[in-house]
Amino acid sequence: MAGIYIAMGAMVYLSISDKLAASLFFATGILLVLNLHNRLFTRVCPLFAYNGSYRPGDLFIAWIGNGIGTALVAILIHFTRFEAGILGRIEEIVIPKLADSPVSLTILGLFCALFVAFAVFVGGIRQKQGTFAQIFYVWLFITAFV
């Protein structure tokens, strides 16, 4: 389900032209993952390293499951009118990345993963679920990387 929640957040992100507003709404996918205890890969990794609450096999399950959930949403969107509205925004995001170097993409990907890990750790572990503090920290870190 985590891949589905993140893909839904991405759908909203892609449909809003204002980047700040879009970033704020993208975080709803992360909040769903945290509050519904789903296995988002970028949640499982830091918790595996931090407190061992996940096993190595959980990393694989989360990775495959996230990919399946995301692919399912992408396939379903393909059959809706929503697809036409977000294709231009997808191109704006993807084209610069295709022109970037592998080293740059790796470094930026690591920073992205760190921001998600911070959101999970500070917002999802250190704060009570559904509190203003949890929502604030998740939105802060996710908005920063998006």
Predicted features and spans:
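Alpha-helical transmembrane segments and their helix-helix packing motifs
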Residues: 1-146
